[in-house]
């Protein structure tokens, strides 16, 4: 958040259920909301914590795998805890996958929700290349840009007003569509550290022109969409682990995110 703010950017802070029990995390979110205008959102990832395990007797975090009865109970617990800590309900939520029944329930029960990160693993035609028995192909075929999901199927855009689920859904990351023809694409995206995971940088200079080129490709979509373009840069604290990640040292992790924020900040200052 600090790096984004230094570059004149606002962020969406996705609070997890576990973080709602952390006074320091709540105070940081409140401060950045009041001072910088950051949005405080509610993620349905990060469910596992002592309180969750005691009630639901599981370490599973995949809300789409629970029964509908449990989904409703979890949503109620998480949303009400959020309200207790912040005094309002969130306008956006998200998970790695949000099935239609879950989305419909959230919109009906908490109508303030307008937006949700509703899918991830949007790799496309080569998604099968990295499937295993924990993920299968549940996420294959997720849309690549914002869409209005159908009440019947999250991955299907609503065909008309009757099918409109009442929210705008967005993908977890903005992937490189071209790269997905050669592989599953999860190492290629506008997330700076996806670029590191894909080893798409100069190991001597720690520069990554690919990142800026891909961001510009997404910006160019405005030419074909009445001036509108969409791009996501989704990052959590774990992506800047002091012990390193993806075989990269902390210094490179930090630099990539800092440079990414600086590039977006530069574009904003230029009115782009």
How does the language model describe each region?
Residues 15-97, 163-192, 227-244, 272:
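Metal-dependent polysaccharide deacetylase catalytic core of the NodB/CE4 family, i.e.
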Residues 22-32, 142, 213-220:
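Alpha-helical scaffolding within the catalytic cores
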Residues 3, 7, 31-35, 81, ...:
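Alpha-helical structural signal in soluble globular domains
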């Amino acid at each position: 958040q600090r790096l984004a703010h230094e570059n004149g950017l606002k962020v969406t802070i996705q609070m997890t259920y576990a973080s709602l029990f952390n006074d320091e995390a709540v105070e940081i979110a409140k401060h950045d909301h009041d001072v910088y205008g950051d949005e405080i959102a509610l993620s349905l990832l990060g469910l596992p914590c002592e309180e969750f395990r005691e009630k639901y007797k599981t370490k599973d975090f995949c809300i789409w795998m629970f029964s509908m009865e449990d989904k409703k109970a979890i949503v109620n617990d998480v949303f009400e805890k959020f309200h207790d800590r912040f005094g309002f309900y969130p306008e956006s939520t998200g998970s790695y996958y949000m099935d239609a029944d879950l989305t419909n329930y959230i919109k009906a029960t908490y109508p303030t929700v307008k937006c949700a990160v509703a899918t991830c693993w949007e790799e496309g035609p080569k998604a099968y290349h990295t499937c295993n028995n924990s993920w299968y192909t549940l996420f294959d075929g997720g849309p690549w840009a914002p869409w209005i999901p159908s009440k019947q199927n999250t991955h299907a855009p609503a065909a008309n007003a009757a099918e409109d689920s009442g929210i705008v859904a967005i993908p977890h990351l903005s992937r490189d569509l071209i790269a997905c023809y050669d592989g599953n694409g999860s190492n290629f995206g506008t997330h700076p550290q996806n670029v590191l995971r894909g080893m798409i940088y100069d190991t001597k200079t720690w520069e990554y022109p690919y990142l800026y080129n891909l961001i510009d490709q997404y910006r160019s979509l405005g030419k074909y969409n009445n001036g509108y373009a969409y791009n996501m840069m989704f990052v959590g604290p774990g992506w800047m682990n002091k012990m390193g990640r993806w075989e990269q040292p902390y210094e490179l992790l930090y630099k990539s995110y800092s440079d990414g924020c600086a590039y977006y900040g530069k574009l904003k200052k230029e009115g782009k």
